[in-house]
Amino acid sequence: MKQKLIKKAQELRQHGFTTGEIADELNVSMDTARWLTLQKPAEEKPEAPVDFFINWKSLGGNSTRLRYVSGALSDMALSHGEAEVILGIAVSGIPFATMMADFLEDMSGVETSLAVYHPHKHRKEKDDGEGAISTNFGSVEGKKVVIVDDVITSGKTVKEVIHAVKDHGGEPIAVTVLIDKSGLSEIEEVPIESLIKVGRL
């Protein structure tokens, strides 16, 4: 399994993916993605960072399954109030957020917009720019916002998004994720809801 991950990470790097994009694609932390891309087959390898590879392709490749999971995430989000904006973290949070906006509008009767956030980790490593809320989707200004992603590993990206939402005048009321590898119950006083929590014994 490890050799397959190393090969996949290196193939993604050759196709121009940044470390952040590789981390998202393989559902591993940035440290693990960096380690995977630096491996050389014939040399002695440093010890790998502790992480878990999450493969949810059987879910991500099926719209019916995505809809069911998005319904469950929507139900969890409702326990924190009525959201006016569902913000998906690019890339893998967007499909969930899109379906959740539809579900939550039907469930709560409150008009619910979709917003998209492009995190800093998707930028080229040499770029010191910040992540950004896309202007092609809904605005978070003056709105109650639920943040959505597929996997939370360290919480760094979610913390970045929470700050961006607040900086744009929004109020983050919850973070919903498919899989939580962080073990955190909240970030910046915003509760985290997950369908699955992963931890080491």
From Swiss-Prot:
GO terms for biological process: 'de novo' pyrimidine nucleobase biosynthetic process; pyrimidine nucleotide biosynthetic process; pyrimidine ribonucleoside biosynthetic process; regulation of gene expression. GO terms for molecular function: DNA binding; orotate phosphoribosyltransferase activity. The gene is gfcR. InterPro entries: GfcR-like (IPR022854), PRibTrfase_dom (IPR000836), PRTase-like (IPR029057). This is Transcriptional regulator GfcR. Keywords: DNA-binding, Transcription, Transcription regulation. Gene3D superfamilies: 3.40.50.2020. Belongs to the purine/pyrimidine phosphoribosyltransferase family. GfcR subfamily. It holds the Pfam family Pribosyltran.
